[in-house]
Curated annotation (Swiss-Prot):
Belongs to the glycosyltransferase 51 family. This is Biosynthetic peptidoglycan transglycosylase. The keyword Oxidoreductase does not apply. GO terms for molecular function: pentosyltransferase activity; peptidoglycan glycosyltransferase activity. Its main location: membrane. GO terms for biological process: cell wall organization; peptidoglycan biosynthetic process; regulation of cell shape. SUPFAM superfamilies: Lysozyme-like. It is found in: Cell inner membrane. GO terms for cellular component: peptidoglycan-based cell wall; plasma membrane. Gene3D superfamilies: Biosynthetic peptidoglycan transglycosylase-like. It comes from Janthinobacterium sp. (strain Marseille). It comes from the Bacteria. The chain crosses the membrane at residues 7-27. Its EC number is 2.4.99.28.
Length: 231
């Protein structure tokens, strides 16, 4: 029986404790970021390591700028494109998740996530790019931690500064400079709409900027963005 108890301890209790400690780390780290800007994210570090495998001197293009120095055009375009209910939900849009789940069942694999802006931020800050229901569950937990600690404006500010916008391009300022040679504060509505549309697949659109889909989707977001509610 002693051997069985020890076995159960190592197989069940220890893994559970490790998972709880990991959640505590996430919780405290998010609390720190309420008043301190993250210098990088898990996803940024992962992408940098990939770039440096080909070029050891490779660096990311990234510059943090305050929320009030980012064009409202870009904020509205991203909300219109990525998460129209951002200002209203509590971090998770369960209707969108249900639709994604049904799509995944139909396809027989995970092809859609139904993620909100807060969920995307949770993934970028801490998680890998793998698609699995286990990772999705962790994403939801971190999402609620973000919503517990931060108001919507702070969540959106961090998102705008760390989201990927191309090969080695992270954040609104780097994206504005990379694609248009202007600061994020100077982005016009058409520029902002195009940047927003790139977000689901930024590395692809970095190299394929003239696709018909990008043009059609940009026109759609231009029509929708004025009604997007900012936090």
């Amino acid at each position: 029986m002693k051997i069985l108890r020890k076995l159960l301890f190592w197989l069940i209790v220890v893994p559970v404790l490790l998972v709880l400690l990991l959640q505590l780390y996430f919780f405290l780290q998010i609390g720190w970021w309420v008043n301190h800007n993250p210098g990088s994210t898990s996803f940024m570090r992962h992408q940098l390591s990939i770039l440096q495998e080909k070029n050891p001197k490779a660096q990311l293009k990234h510059k943090w700028i305050p929320y009030n120095r980012i064009s409202n055009n870009l904020k509205r375009a991203i909300i219109a494109s990525e998460d129209s209910n951002f200002s209203e939900h509590e971090g998770v849009d369960w209707d969108a998740l249900q639709k994604a789940y049904e799509k995944n069942i139909k396809k027989g694999k995970v092809v859609a996530g139904g993620s909100t802006i807060t969920q995307q931020l949770a993934k970028n800050l801490f998680l890998s790019g793998d698609r699995s229901y286990l990772r999705k569950g962790q994403e939801v937990i971190i999402t609620y931690m973000l919503e517990y600690w931060m108001d919507k404006e702070r969540i959106f500010e961090i998102y705008l500064n760390v989201v990927e916008w191309g090969v080695g391009i992270f954040g609104a300022e780097a994206a504005a400079q990379h694609y248009y040679g202007v600061s994020a504060a100077q982005l016009g509505a058409p520029q902002a709409a195009r940047l927003a549309v790139m977000l689901p697949n930024p590395r692809f659109y970095d190299g394929h900027r003239g696709t018909a889909y990008l043009a059609r989707r940009t026109d759609l977001i231009l029509r929708r963005m004025n009604s997007a509610a900012l936090p």
